[in-house]
């Protein structure tokens, strides 16, 4: 369950920001996560609930934006959002494609603090 280490890292980042900016409490945090990252949403929420106890993030609302899977065609230049990884370009049919998005693991985007 790598979600524990991901949440631990996010909480460390929050503590670093708190040391710099002097805030006492996190009300809300927004993360982004690629659809192909392998992060389990339920496990992530559970890990956050457990690991944030007795920290300035305890009770904070956790929002997660999922980033779409995007393939980029090297022939026609189109970047296309897809539901699953495709081996060919939906626009021109070329198999000369690269995975261009959706693999990002986890990123802290926004904090609402007091």
From Swiss-Prot:
Q: Please name the InterPro entries in this protein's record.
A: Hydgase_Ni_incorp_HypA/HybF_CS, HypA/HybF
Q: Where does Zn(2+) bind?
A: 73, 76, 89, 92
Residue numbers binding Ni(2+): 2
Q: Which GO terms describe its biological process?
A: protein maturation; protein modification process
**What keywords are annotated for this sequence in UniProt?**
Metal-binding, Nickel, Zinc
Q: Name one GO molecular function term.
A: nickel cation binding
Zinc among keywords: yes
> Its biological function?
Involved in the maturation of [NiFe] hydrogenases. Required for nickel insertion into the metal center of the hydrogenase.
Instruction: State the similarity comment.
Output: Belongs to the HypA/HybF family.
Q: Name the chain's protein.
A: Hydrogenase maturation factor HypA
**Species name:** Syntrophus aciditrophicus (strain SB)
């Amino acid at each position: 369950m790598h979600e524990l280490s991901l949440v631990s890292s996010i909480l460390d980042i929050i503590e670093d920001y708190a040391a710099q900016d002097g805030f006492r409490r996190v009300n809300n945090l927004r993360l982004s996560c690629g659809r192909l990252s392998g992060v389990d949403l339920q496990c992530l929420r559970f890990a956050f609930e457990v690991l944030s106890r007795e920290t300035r993030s305890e009770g904070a609302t956790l929002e997660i934006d999922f980033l779409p899977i995007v393939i980029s065609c090297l022939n026609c230049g189109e970047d296309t959002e897809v539901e699953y990884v495709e081996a060919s370009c939906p626009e021109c049919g070329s198999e000369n494609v690269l995975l261009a998005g959706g693999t990002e693991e986890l990123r802290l985007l926004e904090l609402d603090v007091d």
